């Protein structure tokens, strides 16, 4: 905040803001282990960051506050239930300070859409506070804090394409030689990740939903930069559960392929569907046809891979 007479030096409080841009993710490959005794599932996944981004602006303030605008903003809490708020508290605790910042999130990543938007926002807050407060917290410490917040948060820091294991938080960079073109179809309503996991457990108890092979061929297709090679290898063991809970997803997946996409997949726990296309022009055509097909709420065209959470405006005096 600035003094009413404009003389900020008299405040003895640093002022300014930092804006961080952070991408959503698509899981190109997602294998889910059986439920463990602690309730978690071991994952093997290939994360892919795409150019659908949230912008998170953090300013110094008297107290911690959170405001959201944009895609699905009215569906999210603006208090300690929000992962971005928790990230601010965790970073402040890590450096022994009070979390006195205001956070503004301009959302484009769908809420409860299987693209890790909440995790992305949390990662962005860590990066923004590190820059705003000039903390120079090392990258390895940021990764540790990210993992404490949730299993998708480390990848939002990492970006690009990565192989995730454990609960998804243990990452290894994957070579991706090309820009891949995507159409993202947002569903009318969200799916809770916990509900999709529970449905997957139920389906496995009563039957044998599809299991994926090893991710090696997916990694080879990414290294080759070939969308035609990658398309038939896209796989998500949570897809059957997501479709079971929201049968309209099957129609959306079918419509995308009929519109000319190489392949379609439910992203993560859904319900966002991601369609791989041969080119930028093909993605525009597929997106236009999907928009008019009545199978989804909104369509976005995106590319990947893109970088993880990064500062787009450094600390500035206000």
From Swiss-Prot:
The keyword Kinase applies. The active site is at residues 25, 152. Residues 2 form a propeptide. It catalyses: 4-CDP-2-C-methyl-D-erythritol + ATP = 4-CDP-2-C-methyl-D-erythritol 2-phosphate + ADP + H(+). Pfam families: GHMP_kinases_C, GHMP_kinases_N. GO terms for molecular function: 4-(cytidine 5'-diphospho)-2-C-methyl-D-erythritol kinase activity; ATP binding. Its EC number is 2.7.1.148. ATP binds at residues 110-120. Keywords: ATP-binding, Isoprene biosynthesis, Kinase, Nucleotide-binding, Transferase. Pathway: Isoprenoid biosynthesis; isopentenyl diphosphate biosynthesis via DXP pathway; isopentenyl diphosphate from 1-deoxy-D-xylulose 5-phosphate: step 3/6. GO terms for biological process: isopentenyl diphosphate biosynthetic process, methylerythritol 4-phosphate pathway; terpenoid biosynthetic process. InterPro entries: GHMP_kinase_C_dom, GHMP_kinase_C_sf, GHMP_kinase_N_dom, IspE, Ribosomal_Su5_D2-typ_SF, Ribsml_uS5_D2-typ_fold_subgr. NCBIfam families: ispE (TIGR00154), PRK03188.1 (NF002870). PANTHER family: 4-DIPHOSPHOCYTIDYL-2-C-METHYL-D-ERYTHRITOL KINASE, CHLOROPLASTIC (PTHR43527:SF2). Catalyzes the phosphorylation of the position 2 hydroxy group of 4-diphosphocytidyl-2C-methyl-D-erythritol. Belongs to the GHMP kinase family. IspE subfamily. Was identified as a high-confidence drug target. This is 4-diphosphocytidyl-2-C-methyl-D-erythritol kinase. It comes from Mycobacterium tuberculosis (strain ATCC 25618 / H37Rv). The lineage of its organism: Bacteria, Bacillati, Actinomycetota, Actinomycetes, Mycobacteriales. The gene is ispE.
């Amino acid at each position: 905040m600035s003094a009413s007479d404009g003389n900020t030096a008299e405040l003895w409080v640093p002022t300014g803001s930092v804006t961080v841009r952070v991408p959503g993710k698509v899981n190109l490959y997602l294998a889910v282990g059986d439920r463990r005794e602690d309730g978690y599932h071991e994952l093997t996944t290939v994360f892919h960051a795409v150019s659908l981004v949230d912008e998170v602006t953090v300013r110094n303030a008297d107290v911690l506050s959170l405001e959201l605008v944009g895609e699905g903003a009215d569906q999210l809490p603006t208090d300690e239930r929000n992962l971005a708020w928790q990230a601010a508290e965790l970073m402040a605790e890590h450096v022994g300070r009070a979390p006195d910042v205001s956070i503004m999130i301009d959302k484009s990543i769908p809420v409860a859409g299987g693209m890790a938007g909440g995790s992305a926002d949390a990662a962005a807050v860590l990066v923004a506070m590190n820059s705003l407060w000039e903390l120079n917290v090392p990258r390895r410490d940021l990764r540790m804090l990210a993992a404490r917040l949730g299993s998708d948060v480390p990848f939002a820091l990492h970006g690009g394409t990565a192989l995730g294991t454990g609960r998804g938080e243990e990452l290894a960079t994957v070579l991706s030689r090309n820009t891949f073109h995507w159409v993202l179809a947002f569903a009318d309503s969200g799916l809770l990740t916990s509900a999709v996991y529970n449905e997957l457990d139920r389906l496995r108890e009563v039957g044998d939903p599809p299991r994926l092979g090893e991710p090696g061929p997916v990694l080879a297709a990414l290294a080759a930069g070939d969308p035609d090679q990658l398309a038939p290898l896209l796989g998500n063991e949570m897809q059957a559960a997501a479709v079971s809970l929201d049968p309209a997803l099957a129609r959306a997946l079918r419509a995308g392929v009929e519109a000319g996409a190489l392949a379609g997949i439910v992203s993560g726990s859904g319900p966002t569907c991601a369609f791989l296309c041969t080119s930028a022009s093909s993605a525009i055509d597929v997106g236009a046809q999907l928009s008019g097909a009545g199978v989804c709420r909104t369509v976005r065209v995106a590319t990947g891979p893109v970088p993880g959470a990064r500062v787009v405006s450094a600390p500035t005096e206000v």
